[in-house]
Design a protein with these regions (language model features):
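Surface-exposed substrate-engagement region within the catalytic domains
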Residues: 229-230, 256, 448-565
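Chitinase-like catalytic core of GlcNAc-active glycosidases
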Residues: 355-402, 411-427, 431-433, 440, ...
Length: 566
């Protein structure tokens, strides 16, 4: 049975409709007053539709975008049916809902025993009755009078509604609806659904030979100010189709990488759309720690060299270290700004053929310099004016060079000094480094001992910096902790790694013979916080000998994420 009509219209009415169509012109009929589809733009910001159940996601998407419709499409909760049904829903401009009731009945018939031997209570109300109620409630909320049922859907379950039922077969669905439905594998994908044209008004009329659809919906005008991101998981087809039916543009991401910050396609789509409302459609987006920040940040359009906004995994940073115009503190200060940028790019280029990762030239600029004298503020640290750093940062931004500003605070604390450079840290290409070697106790002076900092103080800085990043819709920042002795960071296991706005890196600063440096490297890795990235420093004068780029990539294991030259 390819198609059938259940409680649609009487035979005489259907025949009258056919006869009327024979004598009419090709002009589309005027829609009935109650046939208009009404959509609504979601609230400003990000709406994440991430429930584990695809049928629930479809309902939530419908609630987010549709106020009323005379007709809905209901598909069996399986891939074949939903991809075919999606084409009909988008052309008609109506929601696509999923009927998961058959699965729920089967699951509820044989409940899994709990550890006590008694049947488990169903999680999240996923029994047959609640699922049926959720679907029925949504159809009632929408005011739909007609259902197009595709696949293994119980047409009798819709009560007094008119039902046009079709097997999950393209030919059957064409016969049932009079619409052009494709069963080409290329058309049965989330990407193909996203590419379907938005519904057009007064054109979606089934042929005279089709099963009756009454009243015929009049699609709403495409929603403006809204964009959707979905995944390529088949279970997201219904939610995605509902978004397209509302005229919402959609971009599809891999389900295994459902992160706007990591996707050039998502960044470009969000930036170009400039939308006030964003829908994230897919269970995979549920892993995002802060979806709203991720969307706001991606929408800025900023990308690191190599694409995306995440710092590590597929990038290697190669940095020059030092202070502006102070050659004794490192190679960064040995030349003017243009020459520094060129030297950074040349140094980084030596690594390009040694790794599959994108190599990013970097500057690590000492912003507060450890001092032998207390100075007017008594903190044994000279704070450089932001105006001395800005030319480097601006030139770096133009050249695709990342920047890290380094703090050597003396007797003050890291947070106090970090706040002095808030205007610089508010730039997307600027990270922050803390150098505990130069963190003094109230009665200490530099070079008489190695300084240290507590995890608690580090966390006060990371809390503040993460808040800045989130508030300003900035991409994740590199947050560097310099260390070459275990006691330089007290209670290192308590360093907060939970901020999605920061990507932390321990920078091994040891100098001297390579056996000693390798021993330090191994010691620092022991019991380090999970998820930490790693940096290695090559000293031109102090290392015996300094590693070549080839040796750095070959001999330093695990492989480094940042190589700094001083």
């Amino acid at each position: 049975m390819p198609s059938r009509v259940v409680r649609s219209v009487s035979v005489s009415v259907a025949l009258a409709g056919v006869l009327a169509l024979v004598g009419c012109t090709t002009t589309a009929p005027e829609p009935e007053a109650d046939a208009t589809v009404t959509t609504v733009r979601p609230a400003d910001g990000t709406t994440a539709v991430t429930d584990a159940d695809a049928a629930t996601r479809a309902i939530e998407t419908s609630r987010s975008l549709f106020e009323s419709t005379p007709l809905v499409v209901v598909s069996a909760d399986d891939d074949d049916a939903s991809f075919l049904a999606a084409q009909v829903a988008v052309e008609l401009g109506v929601p696509l809902l999923l009927d998961g009731r058959g699965e729920a009945v089967a699951e509820s018939a044989s409940p899994a025993p709990s550890s006590t031997g008694a049947p488990d209570e169903p999680a999240g109300g996923s029994t047959a009755e609640p699922e049926a109620s959720a679907l029925d409630d949504e159809i009632e909320r929408l005011g739909a009078a007609t259902v197009i049922a595709v696949g293994d859907v119980d047409a009798e379950s819709f009560g007094d509604l008119d039902v046009v039922a079709s097997d999950a077969d393209a030919e059957a669905l064409r016969e049932a609806t009079g619409m052009d439905v494709s069963d080409s594998p290329d058309d049965l994908t989330p990407a193909a659904i996203a590419a379907l044209p938005a519904p057009e008004r007064s054109t979606s009329t089934p042929s005279a030979s089709a099963a009756p659809i009454h009243p015929m919906p009049e699609p709403a005008a495409p929603l403006e100010g809204t964009i959707a991101l979905s995944t390529d998981a088949a279970g997201d087809a219904a939610a995605l189709a509902t978004a397209r039916a509302a005229g919402v543009p959609a971009t599809v991401l891999p389900a295994g990488a459902a992160d706007p910050l990591g996707s050039t396609a998502a960044i470009g789509a969000l930036h170009d759309a400039g939308a006030a409302s964003t829908l994230l459609l897919g269970e995979a987006f549920g892993t995002l720690p802060d979806p709203d920040w991720a969307v706001r940040t991606a929408a800025t359009g900023f990308e690191l060299p190599g694409g995306g906004q995440h710092l590590f995994a597929d990038r290697l940073y190669v940095a020059l270290y030092g202070a502006p115009e102070v050659p004794v503190l490192g190679v960064l200060g040995e030349q003017d700004v243009p020459a520094t940028i060129e030297r950074a790019r040349t140094t980084a280029a030596e690594y390009a053929g040694l790794t599959d990762r994108t190599v990013v030239p970097t500057l690590e600029i000492i912003a507060t310099v450890a001092a032998g004298d207390a100075g007017d503020d008594g903190n044994f640290s000279n704070e450089l004016a932001t105006s001395r750093l800005e030319p480097y940062i601006d030139a770096a931004a133009d050249a695709g060079v990342y920047v890290v500003i380094d703090l050597q605070p003396g007797r003050t604390d890291f947070l106090t000094q970090a706040k002095l450079y808030e205007s610089l840290l508010a730039k997307p290409n600027v990270g922050l480094a803390l150098d505990p070697e130069w963190r003094l106790a109230p009665d200490e002076k530099h070079l008489t001992q190695i300084g240290s900092v507590s995890a608690q103080e580090i966390n006060t800085v990371s809390d503040w910096l993460a808040d800045l990043v989130n508030r300003e819709s900035l991409p994740p920042k590199m947050f560097v902790l310099h260390q070459f002795r275990l006691d330089m960071i007290e209670n290192r296991q308590d360093v907060d790694m939970s901020h999605p706005e920061l990507e932390l890196l321990i920078h091994a600063d040891g100098q001297g013979g390579q056996p000693d440096k390798q021993a330090t490297w191994r010691a620092l890795h022991a019991d380090a916080p999970a998820g930490m990235a790693w940096g290695w420093k090559n000293f031109y004068d102090e290392d015996l000998p300094m590693l070549t780029p080839e040796q750095t990539m070959r001999d330093v294991t695990p492989e480094v994420d940042l190589v700094t030259y001083q």
